[in-house]
Amino acid sequence: MNLDDEFDDDLDAERVPNLGIVAESISQLGIDVLLSGETGTGKDTTARRIHNMSGRQGRFVPMNCAAIPESLAESELFGVVSGAYTGADRSRMGYIEAAQGGTLYLDEIDSMPLALQAKLLRVLETRALERLGSTSTIHLDICVIASAQASLDDAVEEGKFRRDLYFRLNVLTLKLPPLRDQPERILPLFTRFVAASAKELNVAIPDVCPLLQQVLTGHRWPGNIRELKAAAKRHVLGFPLLGADSQTEEHMACGLKFQLRAIEKALIQQALKRHRNCIDAASLELDIPRRTLYRRIKELSI
């Protein structure tokens, strides 16, 4: 496997020289890694790929630190024993313990409460934990990958993130650049996402006209790769590239006729697939005469 090719979708080889070698070294050494970058730049995918290359037999366990209420965060992360507090009627492991032998991925760690950061630091340093309400120590064999959208340097200076935890996590930081800083990747990625979406939806691959290319390269892509994937799927379906509310030159050039033609073609292709190219069954589902269906198949080059 060519590791540089495998990681090209998510990381910038110019910012991280010999990226494949770096990624492989990370996975084999099992060191803690910090991924930084805006939303949609591929942090989740990168974390999972590092785990997959590591050869670790345990699970890849993702935890979104921003999605768990602060009142539940400690028990969710460290686990709990029965009777530790009112409502804890059974013992259960937390995210950290569930990653035993594998990789714990702490997504949006910049959202973790300060009190929990101190306890996480102790786990990272000792590679051991006690479940909430227990004095029994559980020794850990885990790799930890954390990601942050905001700058942790700024969060430390603002008192929102512990300096010692930052230094502990910052053994190696991989910065994933936003798509707007890599304009040369927009068209190749979009073309590939369009092909993948067309295959998924079982429809023909639509053209990417020069005007559409201008729209793609002129957009800022605040949602980065995630937004680009969504735009590719909308294009395959014949919908406005940048969402229903956007008024771009692409919409005016393609017009309603183009959009309706693309939607009609997709509907006919999907009906034919469901009925194994049986014209009678497809025309019945689409509620159009057989003669009309034959004509539209020819006109739409299906």
From Swiss-Prot:
GO terms for molecular function: ATP binding; ATP hydrolysis activity; sequence-specific DNA binding. Residues 279-298 bind DNA. The keyword Transcription applies. Regulates the activation of the sigma factor HrpL which itself induces the expression of hprD as well as other hrp loci which are involved in plant pathogenicity, hrmA and avr genes. Probably interacts with sigma-54. This is Pathogenicity locus probable regulatory protein HrpS. The lineage of its organism: Bacteria, Pseudomonadati, Pseudomonadota, Gammaproteobacteria, Pseudomonadales. It holds the Pfam family Sigma54_activat. InterPro entries: AAA+_ATPase, Homeodomain-like_sf, HTH_Fis, P-loop_NTPase, Sigma_54_int, Sigma_54_int_dom_ATP-bd_2, Sigma_54_int_dom_CS. Residues 9-237 form the Sigma-54 factor interaction domain. CDD domains: AAA (cd00009). GO terms for biological process: phosphorelay signal transduction system; regulation of DNA-templated transcription; symbiont-mediated perturbation of host programmed cell death. ATP binds at residues 37-44, 99-108. Keywords: Activator, ATP-binding, DNA-binding, Hypersensitive response elicitation, Nucleotide-binding, Transcription, Transcription regulation, Two-component regulatory system.
